[in-house]
């Protein structure tokens, strides 16, 4: 069986033409509804890579794993320790940090194992292997879904604070708890199809964690692109446009220095949240484009080298999302930086009136 497995793989890479490769892979894996593009993508994963490329990938992912784990744990710890940071904006940032921890704790370790062994073989067999296979494929998009929703709530919170300041009490602690819980419930519902379409397949005595390209998965795939990329981007753009117009009007009419400073602090909080949203969309851009392309029945027939580079960049971008958010928070907010110093030095640096006022408006 292993010789047959090796023969099919060698035959694939010696065969030219998309249709021939599709036929071989259908025999090679299982009778599923793969599109031509996704079939070619699956076989490209079996192409052995040079040792230099493997080492570079391992280094990049290891750095991201450490930075993501440390950064997000610090965000959660600092907000829990510092009273002035317990505001709506920061609670949504903590929610993102919790979802981002899925990346270094679940996603990256499996990626590192696959790259280190230069193999797609799933390291766990039997029922535990099937469960870990399904959960690992489910948690990655679920983490992304929670982050997207958190960004929407952050934008809505900033919109209420600036455009509807008299309605700020609408976002109460109870409503905030409901909003945070809803991000996880929606993430489970939207990505539940991955639990069904992900299979642990035995080929040649080896096990592979593979997603079926069924009609169900493709239909939900298009739906997820709309719900998690296009719709949120449009909504966030509208909200921040309204915020920008309101701030511009306020700056023209403000006379009192104290009121101007109050407006400037709001603007700083807006810039931080906007920076988080922009970097998130940039990090997930390549992944979104490739996801849409993989759902198409006809797509450019890329070489395996180009295909593997693009998908690694997409994966790298997704993983970087879990690193940039803590970096932005520590850059924009003094209270976050003070909290980190307190953790490592054991000293209480306190917080000035300026920090209290800044965080009163969500920064």
Model-derived features: where do they sit?
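Extracellular N-terminal segment of 7TM GPCRs
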Residues: 1-70
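Extracellular TM2-ECL1-early TM3 structural module of rhodopsin-like
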Residues: 50-62, 89-153, 168
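Hydrophobic alpha-helical transmembrane segments of polytopic
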Residues: 57-60, 64, 96, 176-183, ...
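Internal alpha-helical transmembrane segments of multi-pass membrane proteins, especially GPCRs
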Residues: 90, 94-97, 144, 177-181, ...
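Fourth transmembrane helix
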Residues: 102, 106-107, 113-119, 139-153, ...
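Seventh transmembrane helix
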Residues: 282, 288-292, 309-359
């Amino acid at each position: 069986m292993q010789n047959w497995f090796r023969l099919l793989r060698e035959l694939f890479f010696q065969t030219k033409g998309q249709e021939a490769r599709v036929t071989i892979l259908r025999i090679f894996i299982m009778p599923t509804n793969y599109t031509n593009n996704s079939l070619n993508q699956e076989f490209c994963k079996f192409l052995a890579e040079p040792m230099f490329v493997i080492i570079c990938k391992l280094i990049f992912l290891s750095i991201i794993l450490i930075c993501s784990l440390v950064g997000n744990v610090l965000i959660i710890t600092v907000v829990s320790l510092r009273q002035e940071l317990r505001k709506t904006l920061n609670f949504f940032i903590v929610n993102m940090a919790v979802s981002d921890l899925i990346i270094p704790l679940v996603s990256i370790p499996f990626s590192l194992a696959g790259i280190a062994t230069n193999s797609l073989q799933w390291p766990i067999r039997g029922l535990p292997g099937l469960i870990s296979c399904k959960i690992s494929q489910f948690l990655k998009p679920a983490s992304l879904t929670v982050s997207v929703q958190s960004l929407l709530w952050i934008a809505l919170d900033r919109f209420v604070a600036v455009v509807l300041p008299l309605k700020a009490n609408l976002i109460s602690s109870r409503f905030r708890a409901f909003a945070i819980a809803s991000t996880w419930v929606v993430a489970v519902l939207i990505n539940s199809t991955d639990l069904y379409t992900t299979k642990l397949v035995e080929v040649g005595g080896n096990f592979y964690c593979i997603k079926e390209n069924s009609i169900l998965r493709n239909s939900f795939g298009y739906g997820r692109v709309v719900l998690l990329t296009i719709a949120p981007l449009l909504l966030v753009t509208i909200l921040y446009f309204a915020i920008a117009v309101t701030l511009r009007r306020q700056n023209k009419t403000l006379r009192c220095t104290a009121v101007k400073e109050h407006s400037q602090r709001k603007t700083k909080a807006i810039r931080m949240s906007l920076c988080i949203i922009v970097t998130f969309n940039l990090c997930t851009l390549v992944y979104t484009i490739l996801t849409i392309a993989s759902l198409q029945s006809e797509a450019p027939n890329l070489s395996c080298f180009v295909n593997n580079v693009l998908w690694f960049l997409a994966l790298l971008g997704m993983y970087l999302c879990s690193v940039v958010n803590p970096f932005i928070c520590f850059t924009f907010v003094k209270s976050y930086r003070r909290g980190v110093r307190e953790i490592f030095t054991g000293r209480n640096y306190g917080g000035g009136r300026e920090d209290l006022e800044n965080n009163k408006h969500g920064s």
